């Protein structure tokens, strides 16, 4: 994992805006599936080039090969699951803003609407996605072979984020066994990504605290167990080749039900991952002060979100620079990488997303001049 040794590096955390022709093929569903995947090599080559042109240093494939999103993509990569109707719990924030939440993404479903469907575990979980994973790795390797970049990452879901709603596990005796089975299966994906020479990003959003109305004690207990399970799944993988991404969901909502980083940072720092990517926009903008008191362990790198995925407002380069400089003065300039709160693709209009990335590159350049007195 590269450090900001001579300038503030820039990155993001996953999904990027898809080309229009890919979106059109995806909308056609199964009949166009083969054509969609046949178009991926060129689409990945183009998105790698776009990231380089805009000024991103640590890049990925835009997650175009992950049909279903950051977690549901595993429905074709894990055995033991069936797609079935599922009632989801109403979280604390939905109860606090009931009228606002009706019909919104991640909100309360309108009265009379059909239940959503989810991945329901009905049998033993095993990894069956090697062909899909090999395809994604090959596409990204080919794209960066002719377009050198500072570093390359590929994301994979955390074992506790496949389906965490009640009723998802109908096979294993306990939730602990269910999560361990997911971890054992996903460890094949983790290892393949790092064996390819990429940085592994583990997507581990913490919106369960809000969505499941957990108490802080309940959340910390569950998160501590997840860290233990993940560390087991990461056995043999260098911590310097792993980064974790935590956030509070991509919904454009009030986010009053979010945790604060200080409520679980002690547990997060126990993960065998040297990179920590976290949400630091709007409601979380003050959390940089946490590192006045929390000592960043040797080898760890922070990747705060300097771009928000929950608003169309394009952050000013000077604001981005300010966010980077103030944190760098606490933990060391080499230990800070500019990141995003979550994936911008699919949540923001492509024009807005790329404008934000351009602003990030400009802000990182301003921060570099300040921190290196250049």
Locate predicted features.
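Domain-level signal for soluble alpha/beta catalytic cores
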Residues: 1-374
């Amino acid at each position: 994992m590269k450090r900001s040794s001579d300038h503030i590096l820039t990155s993001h955390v996953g999904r990027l805006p898809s080309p229009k022709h890919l979106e059109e093929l995806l909308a056609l569903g199964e009949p166009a599936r083969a054509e969609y995947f046949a178009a991926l090599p060129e689409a990945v080559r183009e998105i790698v080039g776009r990231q380089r042109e805009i000024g991103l240093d640590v890049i990925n494939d835009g997650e175009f090969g992950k049909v279903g999103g950051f977690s549901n993509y595993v429905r074709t990569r894990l055995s033991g699951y069936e797609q079935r109707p599922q009632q989801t719990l109403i979280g604390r924030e939905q109860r606090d803003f009931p009228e606002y939440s009706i019909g919104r993404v991640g909100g309360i479903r309108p009265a009379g609407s059909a239940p959503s469907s989810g991945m329901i575990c009905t049998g033993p979980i095993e990894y069956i996605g090697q062909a899909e994973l090999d395809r994604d790795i090959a596409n990204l390797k080919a794209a960066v072979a002719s377009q050198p970049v500072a570093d390359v990452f590929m994301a994979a879901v955390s074992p506790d984020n496949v389906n965490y709603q009640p009723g998802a596990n109908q096979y294993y005796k306990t939730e602990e066994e269910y999560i361990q089975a997911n971890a054992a299966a996903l460890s094949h994906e983790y290892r393949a990504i790092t064996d390819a020479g990429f940085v592994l990003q583990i997507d581990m959003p913490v919106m369960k605290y809000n969505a499941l109305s957990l108490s802080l004690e309940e959340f910390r207990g569950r998160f501590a167990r997840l860290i233990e399970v993940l560390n087991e799944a990461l056995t043999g993988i260098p911590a310097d080749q792993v980064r974790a991404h935590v956030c509070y969901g991509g919904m454009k909502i009030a986010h009053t039900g979010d945790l604060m980083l200080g409520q679980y940072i002690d547990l997060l720092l126990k993960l065998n991952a040297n990179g920590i990517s976290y949400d630091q926009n709007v409601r979380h903008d003050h959390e940089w002060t946490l590192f006045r008191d929390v000592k960043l362990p040797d080898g760890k790198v922070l990747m705060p979100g300097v771009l928000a995925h929950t608003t169309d407002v394009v952050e000013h380069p000077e604001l981005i620079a300010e966010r980077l400089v103030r944190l760098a003065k606490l933990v060391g300039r080499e230990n800070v990488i500019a990141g995003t709160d979550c994936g911008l693709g699919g949540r923001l209009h492509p024009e807005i997303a790329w404008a934000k990335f351009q602003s990030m590159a400009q802000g990182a350049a301003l921060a570099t001049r300040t921190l290196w007195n250049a």
